[in-house]
Amino acid sequence: FTCFTTPSDTSETCPIGNNICYEKRWSGHGMQIEKGCVASCPSFESHYKFLLCCRIENCNQ
C-alpha cells in the first residue's frame, strides 16, 4: 500500500497495518500541509482547515 508523504511529497510504501492515506492542512506561517500513512484517521482539530482520510493507494496526492 502506498501514500504520498511529506516532506518529500512522493509516493512511498507504508508500514504494514498503515493502510489509510491522510492529508491535513492548517495555517501557521503560511499554509502547512502534512501527508502520510496511518492505521486510523487522525482526529480533526479546530485549527485544521482540511483533513482527508482515504483507503485508495496514493489518494492523498
From Swiss-Prot:
Q: What is this protein called?
A: Weak toxin CM-1c
Q: In which tissues is it expressed?
A: Expressed by the venom gland.
Keywords from UniProt, A to Z, are: Disulfide bond, Secreted, Toxin
This protein's record includes keyword RNA-binding: no
Specify whether Transferase is a keyword of the entry: no
Q: Can you list the disulfide-bonded cysteine pairs? A: C3-C21, C14-C37, C41-C53, C54-C59
Q: Which Gene3D superfamilies would you find in this protein's record?
A: CD59 (2.10.60.10)
Q: Which CDD domains match?
A: TFP_snake_toxin
Q: Which SUPFAM superfamilies match?
A: Snake toxin-like
Recorded GO CC terms:
extracellular region
**What is a single molecular function from GO for this protein?**
toxin activity
Q: What is its main location?
A: secreted
At the top level, the lineage of the source is Eukaryota
| Entry's localization field | Secreted
**Which family does the UniProt entry place this protein in?**
Belongs to the three-finger toxin family. Short-chain subfamily. Orphan group VI sub-subfamily.
Which ranges does the record mark as transmembrane?
Answer: none
Taxonomic classification: Eukaryota, Metazoa, Chordata, Craniata, Vertebrata
Pfam families named in the record: Toxin_cobra-type (PF21947)
